[in-house]
């Protein structure tokens, strides 16, 4: 099949947030009157057929992950109680792990949280899902501090933590945490400007706090040691000033 022929060892079905399979599951979207609509058993049919087909073609060792909107946070949509009824069927059909988020496009402020949401605010939904499956459960949602992530894991609300925007802001987050360099971690501030904001308007994704995003292999953005190091004074402590200080120091200049 296509995935296996490309040498992949897993596939991740992102089917929350109003995407196709989610539309079949959700009573808000699904108005069909055939065997794929109506009660929960019928609304699950499409998802289960896809999972069973992938499992049949890719074999038992192929890892299959599944993203769910545990609660669509909209009137008439899926609730966490619906999801707790659905997950055991997906589990039995062959899903290896679940990635739990919330919301759909109509409630996208909760789906892609800004700085006004508390860190790890979706973890309680992951805990609800963990109660009905033995498979690993991932939580997401404004988690930009590895110590917060660790507290979620220790409280058994999730088995794994998903860093999305935080991985853009500082790809070295896990390594710095492993080395105990917590204060060196550059944290996503949840501004939604360079990442979601740019992509939604057709621009290339970026990050307000990490200018290398999208330019990782661009020679103009690479650090080159200065032939004649100088003393450099940076006036201003905003993102631009801080990055200027970092770049100058990495080039070997003495920054004040």
Residue ranges and their predicted role:
Residues 1-12:
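Single conserved hydrophobic/aromatic residue that forms the stacking wall/gate
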Residues 10, 63-67, 96-99, 136-138, ...:
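Structural preference for beta-strand elements that scaffold enzyme active sites
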Residues 21-46, 75-81, 108-120:
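Glycine-rich tight-turn/loop motif centered on a GG-T
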Residues 86-127, 131, 135, 247:
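Glycine/Thr-rich beta-alpha phosphate-binding loop at enzyme active sites
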Residues 143-157:
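Catalytic cores of alpha/beta
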Residues 157-176:
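Glycine-rich phosphate-binding active-site loops on the catalytic face of alpha/beta enzymes
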Residues 171, 177-229:
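Cysteine-cluster motifs in flexible loop/terminal segments that predominantly coordinate metals
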Residues 232-256:
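N-terminal Rossmann-like FAD-binding beta1-loop-alpha1 element of flavoenzymes
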């Amino acid at each position: 099949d296509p995935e296996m022929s490309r040498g992949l060892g897993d596939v991740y079905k992102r089917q929350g947030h109003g995407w196709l399979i989610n539309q079949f599951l959700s009573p808000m979207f699904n108005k069909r009157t055939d065997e794929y609509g109506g009660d929960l058993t019928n609304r699950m049919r499409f998802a289960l057929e896809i999972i069973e087909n992938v499992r049949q073609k890719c074999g038992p060792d192929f890892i299959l992950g599944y993203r769910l909107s545990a609660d669509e946070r909209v009137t008439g949509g899926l609730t966490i109680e619906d999801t707790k009824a659905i997950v055991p069927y997906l589990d039995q059909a062959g899903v290896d792990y679940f990635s739990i988020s919330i919301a759909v496009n109509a409630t996208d402020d909760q789906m892609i949280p800004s700085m006004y949401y508390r860190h790890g605010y979706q973890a309680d939904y992951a805990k609800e899902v963990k109660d009905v499956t033995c498979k690993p459960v991932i939580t997401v949602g404004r988690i930009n501090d590895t110590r917060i992530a660790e507290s979620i894991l220790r409280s058994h609300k999730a088995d794994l933590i998903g860093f999305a925007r935080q991985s853009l802001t500082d790809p070295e987050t896990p390594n710095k945490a492993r080395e105990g360099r917590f204060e060196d971690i550059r944290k996503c501030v949840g501004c939604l400007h360079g990442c979601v904001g740019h992509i939604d308007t057709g621009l290339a994704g970026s990050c307000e706090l990490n200018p290398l995003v999208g330019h990782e292999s661009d020679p103009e953005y690479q650090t080159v040691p200065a032939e004649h190091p100088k003393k450099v004074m940076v006036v201003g402590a905003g993102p631009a000033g801080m990055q200027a200080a970092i770049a100058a120091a990495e080039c070997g200049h003495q920054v004040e």
